[in-house]
């Protein structure tokens, strides 16, 4: 593991609160150069060949990570994510871009000093300028760097939904909008981004392939020096054939109204992919004053990503109740939906080894069912990769019923299991509580807590009086659970269906059962029957059963 693994400092940058690794100068140069080279390769494929080797979401997040590292180490940026090397056409009016607010409160502050506000979906595609002269579409220019772009005229003219001829005030106009992938009933929350931006870019890069352009549409979101009234703009655009703008532009006056529309467009079917919403004021400066990065009359509020790139700070190993070793990645903290995620389970040692994850790697994390974090893939591996060795595989279902230094992890896992709702239902007793109690009373085995007196509990440091009373109450209630609950607390390897069918009511009856009688229970085969016989006759288990009998537990 790196000398500085897990050590971070915080700096404020234009990218927000950046997490800065405590790297040496040499290591920082190595890591920045490696990620920069990868992003450059993706850029070349995207802009020169019209293909994407990585999803939009991963690209955006790793590009942001690179900029954070460059900011942390005062490293001159060498990669631009929009290389307009061959873009020579100047936009009549610059593309300003949009500031992205962090949430509802920042949006509320921005809206406070502005009026005549309108909300639109943030359509996910590629930006374009359309130039109409004497009623004809004479030029289409890719966004490029916001000042100059490529000549896309012939390709845009081949998009069926783009009007080639317009009338009235649009006859001499410049429009800015988004070329998007046309969709049928796209529900953003369910279907995600579909890598739409990269797909559109790929289609626009291809030469002499007009067929694919039929799958594209355009959403107009700006009309520099157009009518001052938004309703008039929308009316004129609709009459010209740009119907989507009026359909998806709504007047708003509060952040609550914006939030309502944001939720609606996230969960309802739309004809395009989106990645958030845009709020704009119809009160704009004259077009000649538009500059890249200075569009303060418009902001975006993006959707929370369904997955996030996170840096692995450390790899830890956990020994479970049955002795199985699981691997956990400790992460740089990320936000997924309403959850703050700092750890993710990688599964068994063999799965971790197959995933090949080490501290310093960047992994894509999402939420599975019931909001449980999961690893989707490794998106970037660091240069200096050192993986810790897993603990020796010496634990199994019959180890660590008794406390010892080498057994503590499995020992505490057994305590957490027996106090869980489905076993003895000792609410509020988790890993940290059991560790505190063991530190105080030096438990010999997993049932030693039964010998702790009320007087001792009332003097336990680290617990307030109400918590002490609750703890004693839970201990007392546990004593009255039926025999079957207690054998589950012991850890007997008995499936639920077999436990339900089990007709014995004492430990003696359990020990009298042979493999043949065990095999008659549902879900019990030859191997499980053998393990059950082994379990109930194990010397440690026998001693624990005897001890439970001495404590007056039913059936023992």
Swiss-Prot record:
Keywords: DNA damage, DNA repair, DNA replication, Ligase, NAD. GO terms for biological process: DNA repair; DNA replication. It comes from the Bacteria. The keyword NADP does not apply. PROSITE patterns: DNA_LIGASE_N1, DNA_LIGASE_N2. Its EC number is 6.5.1.2. Pfam families: DNA_ligase_aden, DNA_ligase_OB. The active site is at 122 (n6-amp-lysine intermediate). Belongs to the NAD-dependent DNA ligase family. LigB subfamily. Catalyzes the formation of phosphodiester linkages between 5'-phosphoryl and 3'-hydroxyl groups in double-stranded DNA using NAD as a coenzyme and as the energy source for the reaction. This is DNA ligase B.
């Amino acid at each position: 593991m790196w000398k500085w693994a897990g050590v971070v400092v915080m700096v404020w940058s234009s990218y927000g609160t950046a997490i800065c690794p405590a790297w040496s100068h040499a290591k920082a140069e190595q890591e920045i150069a490696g990620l920069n080279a990868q992003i450059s390769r993706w850029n070349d494929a995207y802009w020169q060949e019209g293909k994407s080797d990585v999803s939009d979401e991963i690209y955006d997040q790793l590009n942001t990570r690179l900029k954070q590292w460059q900011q942390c180490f005062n490293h001159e940026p060498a990669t631009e994510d929009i290389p307009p090397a061959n873009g020579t056409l100047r936009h009549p009016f610059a593309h300003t871009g949009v500031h992205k607010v962090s949430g509802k409160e920042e949006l509320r502050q921005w809206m406070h000093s502005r009026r005549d506000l309108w909300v639109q979906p943030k359509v996910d595609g590629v930006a374009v300028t359309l130039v109409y002269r004497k009623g004809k579409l004479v030029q289409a220019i890719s966004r490029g760097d916001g000042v100059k772009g490529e000549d896309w005229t012939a390709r845009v003219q081949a998009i069926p939904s783009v009007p080639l001829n317009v009338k009235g005030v649009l006859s001499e106009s410049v429009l800015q909008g988004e070329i998007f992938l046309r969709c049928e009933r796209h529900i953003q929350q369910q279907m995600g981004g579909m890598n739409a931006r990269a797909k559109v870019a790929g289609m626009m890069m291809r030469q002499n392939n007009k067929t694919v352009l039929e799958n594209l549409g355009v959403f107009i979101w700006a009309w520099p020096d157009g009518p001052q009234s938004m309703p008039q703009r929308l009316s004129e655009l609709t009459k010209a054939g740009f119907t989507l703008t009026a359909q998806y532009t709504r007047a708003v006056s509060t952040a609550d109204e914006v939030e309502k529309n944001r939720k609606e467009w996230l969960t309802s079917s739309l004809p395009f992919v989106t990645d958030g919403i845009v709020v704009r004021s119809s009160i704009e400066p004259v077009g000649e004053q538009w500059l890249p990065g200075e569009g303060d009359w418009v902001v975006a509020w993006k959707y929370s990503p369904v997955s996030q790139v996170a840096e692995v700070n450390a790899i830890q190993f956990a020994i479970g109740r049955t002795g199985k070793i699981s691997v956990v990645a400790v992460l740089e903290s990320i936000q997924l939906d309403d959850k703050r995620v700092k750890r993710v389970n990688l599964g068994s040692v063999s799965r971790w080894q197959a995933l090949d994850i080490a501290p310093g790697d960047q992994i894509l994390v999402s939420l599975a069912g019931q909001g449980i974090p999961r690893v989707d893939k490794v998106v970037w591996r660091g240069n200096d990769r050192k993986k810790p060795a897993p603990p020796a595989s010496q634990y199994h279902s019959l180890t660590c019923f008794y406390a010892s230094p080498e057994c503590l992890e499995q020992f505490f896992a057994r305590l957490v299991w027996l106090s869980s709702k489905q076993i003895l239902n000792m609410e509020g007793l988790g890993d940290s509580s059991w560790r505190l109690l063991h530190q105080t009373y030096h438990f010999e085995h997993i049932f030693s807590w039964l010998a702790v007196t009320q007087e001792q509990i009332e003097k336990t440091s680290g617990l307030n009086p109400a918590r002490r009373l609750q703890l004693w109450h839970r201990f007392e209630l546990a004593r009255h659970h039926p025999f079957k609950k207690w054998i589950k607390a012991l850890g007997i390897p008995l499936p639920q269906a077999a436990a339900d069918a089990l007709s014995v009511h004492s430990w003696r009856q359990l020990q009298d059962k042979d493999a043949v009688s065990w095999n008659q229970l549902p879900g019990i085969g030859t191997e499980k029957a053998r393990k059950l016989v082994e379990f109930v006759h194990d010397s440690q288990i026998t001693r624990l059963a005897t001890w439970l009998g001495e404590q007056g537990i039913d059936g023992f």
